[in-house]
Structures are given as structure tokens and as C-alpha cells.
Curated annotation (Swiss-Prot):
GO BP, one annotated term: pyridoxine biosynthetic process
Keywords: Flavoprotein, FMN, Oxidoreductase, Pyridoxine biosynthesis
Keyword Flavoprotein: yes
Protein role: Catalyzes the oxidation of either pyridoxine 5'-phosphate (PNP) or pyridoxamine 5'-phosphate (PMP) into pyridoxal 5'-phosphate (PLP).
Record-given protein name: Pyridoxine/pyridoxamine 5'-phosphate oxidase
InterPro entries: Pyridox_Oxase (IPR000659), Pyridox_Oxase_CS (IPR019740), Pyridox_Oxase_N (IPR011576), Pyridoxamine_oxidase_dimer_C (IPR019576), Split_barrel_FMN-bd (IPR012349)
Subunit structure: Homodimer.
One function term, GO molecular function aspect: FMN binding
Source organism: Paracoccus denitrificans (strain Pd 1222)
């Protein structure tokens, strides 16, 4: 019998993630949507940085986590090469965290356009001016480029082709809550219905699992 209840209860990990994030937005002093995004470079070395989660889409069957960035940045190049990423969100005020691993795809251009248009004008110009992750002579050089582009692009710049969004489609989601004496609670959700695996099962005449996610309590 499962002892998964309280803040861990439910049959949709994306609903749980939304609930935790909403609670964190009421208790964290700033950037409750900050997440440490991990990728792997061409040499197999891990890389990590903080980015902002902008949406939790869908539900158990098709959910994803969305963020936006420069496609030509280090993280963009690494994601394009590997198609995978992981992230962790940790909230000190709640003493909880969420870990996610999965495959990554680009969001639709129309969605990226809409989000880009919602940003402050200076941020939109900055997306054009910054050659993210590449060497920069000085901050003065960057601000000069921002000023130049501010004049040439006007008040309604279009989205740069090198800037847009990514969706992380999880294969694993772990929910963690602090416990006394380091006896934490951890529940790992693992997606059990990979399309390739299901196709192989169907080809062999075997039954395809009906449960989309398998949930396992982990030792702290």
C-alpha cells in the first residue's frame, strides 16, 4: 500500500509541480521559477547554469517544462547536439526540490514570438545585442551595441532567429521534501510508456502498460 500522500499526492506529476511552484511563489523572496539547468558538452563534460522556468505545459500524458534562451549559447549548442537536459528547482522557504531529466525540443515559432513580444523592450533588444556565451571585450561594448540596435530596431523588434524556447519532455521527475535528521521523503516518477518501447511490445504481440508513470519511493 502506498504511503504517498499530502504534498506528494496525485496521479499527475505536472499538477504536483504546478502546486509546489505556486506555493513557492508565495514564500520565496525572488525568482521562485529559477532552475539549475544541466547539459553535456561535446567532450562529455557536464555544464550547469541558472535559467527561469516560464511554463509547465500539459499533464501526465504530454506535459513539459518550458524555458527560453539564445539557441547559440553554450546551453543551446549542447542541447541541439544531444537533445537532452536535466534541471533541479530548490526552494529554501519550502525545504523542497524537484529534479527532472528528459528530452528537449524547440517550441513552435509562434509561441516563441508571443513570449518574446511580452518582454520589456530593453530585454528584446538585449536578445539581439548579446552574443551569449562568447567572449566580450567590455561591458561598454555591449551597451554600445544595445544603443545602436535600439535605434535601428525601433519600438517593435521582431524575435531574433537565434532566440527562442525549449520544451523539456521528462522521462523522470523526482519530488523531494526535507525531513528531520536527514530522513527526507523522495518520490521518483518514471515514464513507462516510451513510444519506441510500446511499438516493440505491440510488434511482439505483448500488452502495452496502461500506467503512464511508475512511482517509486527512494531512500533519502
Amino acid at each position: 500500500m502506498s504511503d504517498r500522500g499530502g504534498i506528494f499526492a496525485g496521479d499527475d506529476p505536472f499538477a504536483i509541480a504546478r502546486s509546489w511552484l505556486a506555493e513557492a511563489e508565495r514564500t520565496e523572496p525572488n525568482d521562485a521559477n529559477a532552475m539549475a539547468l544541466a547539459t553535456v558538452d561535446a567532450d562529455g563534460l557536464p555544464d550547469a547554469r541558472m535559467v527561469l522556468l516560464k511554463d509547465i505545459e500539459g499533464g501526465a500524458a504530454d506535459g513539459s517544462f518550458v524555458f527560453y534562451t539564445n539557441y547559440e549559447s553554450a546551453k543551446g549548442v549542447e542541447i541541439e547536439a544531444t537533445g537532452v537536459a536535466a534541471f533541479v528547482m530548490h526552494w529554501k522557504s519550502l525545504r523542497r526540490q524537484i529534479r527532472v531529466r528528459g528530452h528537449v525540443t524547440r517550441v513552435e515559432p509562434e509561441l516563441a514570438d508571443a513570449y518574446y513580444a511580452s518582454r520589456p523592450l530593453q530585454s528584446r533588444i538585449g536578445a539581439w545585442a548579446s552574443r551569449q556565451s562568447r567572449p566580450l571585450a567590455s561591458r561598454g561594448a555591449l551597451m554600445a551595441e544595445v544603443a545602436r540596435l535600439g535605434i535601428s530596431l525601433g519600438l517593435n523588434p521582431s524575435r531574433p532567429p537565434h532566440w527562442g524556447g525549449y520544451r523539456i519532455h521528462p522521462v523522470q521527475i523526482e519530488f523531494w521534501a526535507d525531513g528531520a535528521f536527514r530522513l527526507h521523503d523522495r518520490f521518483r516518477w518514471t515514464k513507462s510508456s516510451y513510444q519506441g518501447e510500446n511499438s516493440a511490445l505491440r510488434d511482439e504481440g505483448q500488452e502495452v502498460p496502461q500506467s503512464l508513470w511508475q512511482v517509486c519511493r527512494l531512500s533519502p
